[in-house]
Design a protein with these regions (language model features):
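Structural motif
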Residues: 33-35, 44-57, 69, 155
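Short, polar/charged loop or turn motifs at beta-strand boundaries
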Residues: 164-187, 195, 200, 210-215, ...
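Short, acidic, small-residue-rich periplasmic hinge/interaction motif at the N-terminus
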Residues: 17-35, 64, 105-107, 127-170, ...
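Primarily recognizes Gram-negative and organellar outer-membrane beta-barrels
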Residues: 218-221, 243-294, 308-1013
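Short acidic/polar hinge/loop motifs at secondary-structure boundaries
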Residues: 214-242
Length: 1013
């Protein structure tokens, strides 16, 4: 009797192998169906290489009677290598108790005999795992090496392997010295945005892995910027269950993660690699001081690794504050420019070790020091009933920050039974610590104007606003003027501990228990110093208001979370899962926020009387407490959240026209519904001067639910998923207090004891498919908010004061629909087209008014956005690649509000890119793009900017060196001005950044492979 049960033990542990398992289990049932009510126990074991612990293909074996070694049954051997999981295993069916011998063999390995003692078959036990089996290789024989046969073929860029999308890294042209981020940007159906945000077929990835293992806790920017592209063999993408819910009751109800897994070439799977890069350059144009700003880049990256361990050390230093590379399609518009000068120094390390498929531990430590200098000058207009107001502001800020992060985790797994009590034991422990220290210095000068006269003084505006005596324009048009100097310094510490435990009874596979325990503690301390002067140049009756403010802030918070749960597998094939869980959460917060007005002291009422950061004696300082703007509170929150969920799983094979199943084409689907009811008791002890001294309690019972559906046709790369969720939340307790905060004289906030709960409905649907070499995706979502929290305000046109009150409004909703397609124009894939289209609508409801209306009224703004992005790539040879493309964005905003000016604005770009490999190991890459804006009523916002970037490189193979020169914005047309328009107003901001510069840098590569035996 042939019994194929492949990995049935993993069927309930890992959704990614459920198709193979369920099919194999079905065969076991068929083979045993000749007898009714026959109990079948599936016995399986992992099989690995004795030294490397790699998977072994071609496993086979038999089950023998231990007493006389007679043949009993065949054994199924298989392997699995998808979705980041590798497994080679043997599996057999046991129909009656007894002692057996399992004979395991594979080509090139010594045969192994494993004893198997089954004392009893239990009614509700369907599988049992054995300890991992390790095979030793046979001694090597003398072999004759044959000459290599070279076959040239068109390189396939991507294909489907089951439900995994696989990209072939060697099929893409890349510039010399390219890191992983340059490769990812070229993958069909993939887009990458600033900050390492990556979308695959329209869906954002949640986690990035290296060879199936987490890398720096998914710090994808570190991996993207430091892993050389030449080391990569494949980039794969697939969905998987998040690590933090594996084994828990919510495993099947949890939203799956979209993963991008970077697979290295075989020659880089073991050994040492090191990369060093250094460079320097200058801006092409002079700064405000008449000098060229210097640019520098330094990078060190070293990694020792094999299939089961990894050690990484890295160091980075640069002042580029940029992430783009010349010669590629990029976003070089002013909106994508950096906002200041930033210098960063980073040092860190990472380690990983796993062994015997039983434990895995990993950790990392990283420290960063940064210096930032920002200077911003801005013009703005605020749209108001009865007439707009206008503003000019000048801000400078210097920041120094240092932080250190360390995080470690340990996984322990024991699949086989432990005595007669439990099996499938999984333990997870993760501690982490973060410490941050900072120091900020800033100066600000601003004015609010009743008329748009910003252009009349030009650069002299700053001197005019800063001058003690207001000039003629300010005396005529300025509603108010502020000048301030500030200093903020502090530090924070955050510790986090998370642990999981889950297991099954030793002889019952229809139930699983889990327990999660976590604790978080944070401590925050900051000191704010501020010299603030407010005056009213156009008024002869309103006095100036100078404040010397000191605010020491202390916040401490800790959270304890305990969550037990149980999963019941129902049905003969366990296709139903009933998940019952309970979550207990305890949160304790303490906050102390005093405000001291040092200007109340004699001799402290002028900005130049005492240096910023100077404090009087303790007794003097206590006498200046602004009690009504100081608060002290302690809040405790205890929450009990029962949860119930039901999951139905479906699977099968695709059928042909005749109704016959196609063996290698399978499908998988599930439907899940989950319901939660968090019930919380909150207690807040709050004091605020003469306004409030109260002990406030609140009991809330909320309802939350979500329904998720998923369907996947593995081999064809087709998937459909949808989700509906309802989230309810209660307003912050401090917003319910009847208090007034006027610590900022131009921004006064009030409380509202009549706030209601907010309810958010979200609908999401997504479809993706692959037709040959064509990739297509479409998605849509709708979000509806009931009783949305709005910070309604009344604006006083005479003083410029905003009085803000939280309130609930109905009518807020938005929708978004998009699609993307990536396809070849020719069979040889030399011409390729990529297109993305998107439409969004936002129905925004807010509350605002003026001192003329006295009340805040509903303000509804309707905004439509349409985006079309089209690009064409031509790759005539492996040494050349050219591209052309364009992007159009249209914004249309309307409102029934009086004095509202409709917005009909266009932003569009078009350009070309090219990359050519030259003789003498040289390469040139360049891009030329025109960025334009049209449709703005303000003429200065309708702009054209032609941007040209280029890179030239020279490779020195013998020295393992690459020399590169990058030229950014060679024409000097890219502005350091950002312009924004929305329903609330428009802003034009100037930043202290010169985006036009050149950089010469050198890259050194080192790679050491292990000696071949």
């Amino acid at each position: 009797m042939l019994a194929l049960v492949g990995l049935s033990a993993m069927a309930q542990e890992n959704d990614t192998v459920s198709m193979q398992v369920n099919d194999s289990t079905a065969l076991v049932e068929q083979s045993a169906s000749v007898k009714k009510n026959v109990r079948v126990l599936s016995v399986n074991a992992e099989v690995r290489d004795h030294l490397t612990h790699d998977i072994i293909k071609g496993l086979k074996g038999v089950k023998l009677n231990a007493a006389d070694s007679t043949f009993v049954d065949s054994i199924y051997g298989g392997y699995y290598d998808e979705n980041g999981y590798k497994s080679s295993y043997i599996s057999c069916a046991v129909l009656k108790p007894g002692k057996y011998l399992i004979k395991v063999e594979a080509e090139g390995y010594q045969t192994v005999y494993v004893p198997l003692d089954i004392k009893k078959l239990y009614k509700r036990e369907t599988y049992r795992s054995l300890k991992p089996i390790y095979l030793k290789r046979m001694p090597k024989r003398n072999e004759i090496e044959l000459d290599e046969v070279v076959v040239k073929a068109t390189k396939l860029k991507f294909y489907m392997n089951g439900d995994t999308l696989v990209y072939n890294a060697d099929a893409f042209n890349l510039a010399e010295g390219s890191m992983l981020n340059e490769l990812v940007k070229k993958l069909p159906g993939v887009t990458m945005e600033k900050g390492g945000v990556i979308n695959v077929n329209g869906k954002p990835i949640d986690t990035m892995l290296l060879n199936g293992k987490d890398f720096f806790n998914s710090d994808r920017e570190l991996l993207l910027e430091n892993m050389p592209a030449y080391m990569v063999k494949h980039v794969t993408s697939y969905e998987r269950v998040p690590d933090n819910v594996k084994g828990k009751p919510e495993e099947k109800s949890a939203k799956k993660q979209l993963v991008m897994d970077v697979r290295l070439k075989k020659e880089y799977a073991r050994g040492w690699i090191a990369n060093a890069e250094g460079g320097g350059g200058l801006t092409f144009h002079r700064n405000e001081q008449g000098k060229h700003d210097g640019k520098f880049l330094g990078r060190l990256f070293g990694m020792r690794f094999d299939d089961h361990s990894r050690l990484v050390l890295f160091a980075n230093a640069n002042n580029l504050n940029d992430y783009r590379t010349p010669g590629e399609k990029g976003e070089w518009t002013p909106l994508q420019q950096s906002e200041g000068l930033r210098t960063t120094y980073k040092l860190g390390g990472n380690y990983m070790k796993e062994r015997e498929e039983r434990y895995h531990y990993q950790g990392s430590m990283e420290t960063t020091y940064s210096e930032t200098e920002d200077r911003q000058n801005s013009n703005s207009a605020t749209f108001l009933e009865g007439g707009d107001t206008y503003g000019r502001s000048f801000n400078t800020r210097k920041s120094y920050g240092w932080d250190i992060n360390t995080r470690h985790y340990l996984n322990l797994q024991h699949d086989e039974p432990i005595g007669d009590f439990i099996k499938g034991l999984y333990v997870y422990v993760q501690p982490s610590v973060n410490y941050r220290k900072w120091n900020h210095l800033g100066d600000n000068a601003s004015t609010t104007l009743s008329e748009d006269v910003a252009s009349q003084l030009g650069k002299a505006w700053m001197d005019s606003i800063m001058a003690p005596d207001a000039g003629g324009l300010l005396r005529k048009y300025a509603i108010n003027r502020t000048r301030s100097s500030s200093k903020n310094q502090g530090h924070s510490t955050n510790t986090y501990f998370d642990s999981d435990l889950n297991f099954r009874p030793a002889h019952n596979d229809y139930i699983r228990f889990s327990l999660n325990l976590s604790h978080n503690y944070s401590d925050y301390l900051s000191k704010d110093y501020d010299h603030y002067l407010l005056d009213y140049p156009s008024s002869t009756t309103m006095p100036a208001d100078f404040r010397n403010r000191y605010t020491p802030v202390k916040n401490r918070e800790q959270t304890l979370n305990v969550s037990p749960g149980v999963t019941f597998s129902l049905g003969k094939k366990r296709q139903f899962d009933l998940i019952v869980s309970y979550n207990f959460n305890y949160n304790d917060q303490k906050s102390n926020n005093p405000l001291y007005l040092l200007n109340k002291l004699e001799g402290w009422d002028k900005a130049d009387s005492h240096a910023l950061g100077t404090l009087p004696s303790v007794d003097e300082m206590l006498s200046t407490l602004d009690a009504d703007n100081s608060s002290n509170d302690k809040t405790t929150r205890t929450s009990h959240e029962p949860s119930i969920a039901l999951t139905k799983t479906f699977w099968g094979h695709v059928k042909d026209k005749d109704g016959k199943e196609i063996e290698d084409e399978s499908w998988y689907a599930y439907l899940n519904a989950r319901f939660r009811m968090p019930c919380a008791h909150e207690r807040m002890d709050y004091q605020r001067g003469t306004q409030v001294d109260t002990l406030m309690t609140r009991n809330t019972a909320l309802f939350r639910m979500d329904v998720t559906g998923y369907y996947s046709l593995f081999k064809r790369g087709r998937s459909v998923n949808f989700n509906y969720s309802l989230e309810s939340s209660a307003p912050m307790m401090t917003n319910l207090l009847n208090i007034r905060d006027d610590s900022n004289p131009l921004y006064v906030t009030l409380g509202n004891p009549h706030m209601k709960n907010t309810h958010r409905h979200s609908f999401y649907g997504q479809y993706s498919d692959k037709f040959g070499k064509t990739m297509f995706n479409a998605n849509a979502n709708v979000n509806i908010v009931q009783n949305a929290e709005a910070m309604g305000y009344i604006y006083n046109k005479e003083t410029g004061v905003r009085t803000v009150t939280p309130d609930n409004v109905d009518g807020n909703w938005n929708m978004n629909a998009g699609s993307g397609i990536d396809f070849p124009l020719t069979k040889n894939d030399k011409w390729r087209v990529k297109e993305n289209a998107n439409y969004s609508y936002n129905h925004s409801v807010d509350l605002n008014g003026t001192n003329e209306t006295l009340v805040a009224t509903r303000s509804v703004v309707r905004t439509h956005n349409v985006t079309e992005d089209l690009s064409l790539t031509w790759r005539p040879t492996d040494k050349m690649e050219f591209g052309a493309g364009g992007k159009l964005t249209y914004q249309h905003s309307t409102s029934d509000r009086e004095y509202f000016t409709n917005i009909d604005a266009f932003t569009f770009q078009y350009g070309v890119t090219g990359q050519i490999d030259l003789p003498w190991n040289m390469q040139v890459g360049t891009d030329l793009t025109m960025y334009s804006r049209r449709g703005y009523s303000e003429a200065s916002m309708n702009t054209n900017e032609l941007v040209w970037n280029a890179r030239i490189s020279k490779r020195l193979p013998k020295q393992n060196l690459t020399i590169l020169f990058d030229g950014f914005d060679l024409l000097g047309n890219l502005s350091n001005v950002r312009r924004y328009v929305n329903a609330q107003g428009r802003t034009e901001a100037f930043y202290n950044v010169i985006p036009s510069y050149g950089l010469l840098h050198v890259i050194y590569r080192f790679n050491k492979e292990p000696k071949k035996k």
